[in-house]
A protein has these predicted regions:
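Hydrophobic/aromatic micro-motifs used in signal-transmission helices and low-complexity FG repeats
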Residues: 12-13, 48, 96
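Active-site-proximal structural segments of metal-dependent nucleotidyl cyclase/transferase enzymes
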Residues: 24-62
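Conserved helix-loop-beta segment at the catalytic/binding core of cyclic-nucleotide signaling proteins
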Residues: 34, 58-61, 66-104, 116, ...
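A short glycine-enriched loop-to-beta-strand structural element that forms part of the catalytic core
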Residues: 90-99, 121-149
Length: 157
């Protein structure tokens, strides 16, 4: 399984590709700054869990079809859960990031709703939520998002 895109859409999920996501993030930051509105990001990571050992991107190649089904099902739930003004991108083989116009409370609620909807046998899902601070650059925001502690989805919602 390869991670490929045409610059606008991911070839597997048809979610936004990284270049399109980064351009839209810059645009949304400018709009939020001008309108003094809130902007949040949600980062989702999915991983295979075998006997308590998590297999991440490095171990993907051996079980392509199972991963593809998991990735596609997660992407479909994301597409069905977001509003038309929000943007969801696949930024890595198992990483999805959402730009959401709204507060961290709204973002957390959406993240938990998505993870409650997506239960895939043998896979775990994690998320982190970040609210953009005024004056932050795209790079600062993405670095902060990468450093956020991931929350494990609880199976018993």
């Amino acid at each position: 399984m390869t991670f490929s895109h045409d610059g606008i859409r991911d070839s597997l999920t048809h979610l936004a590709a990284p270049p399109y996501f980064y351009e839209n993030l810059r645009r949304e930051l400018g709009t939020a700054e001008r309108n003094k509105s809130e902007l949040s990001l949600i980062r989702f990571l999915i991983s295979k869990n075998v006997a308590g050992i998590q297999i991440t991107e490095s171990g993907i190649e051996s079980e392509n079809s199972q991963y593809e089904v998991a990735i596609l099902s997660f992407a479909e739930i994301l597409k069905a859960s977001i509003r038309s003004e929000d943007l969801c991108a696949r930024l890595g083989q198992l990483e999805f990031t959402l730009i959401l116009k709204g507060s961290s409370e709204i973002a957390t609620s959406l993240a938990e709703r998505v993870l409650r909807s997506w239960m895939f046998e043998g896979f775990d899902s994690h998320y982190s939520v970040l609210t953009v601070n005024r004056g932050e650059s795209s790079l600062e925001i993405l670095n902060r998002l990468d450093n956020q502690e991931l929350r494990l989805a609880t199976k018993g919602y």
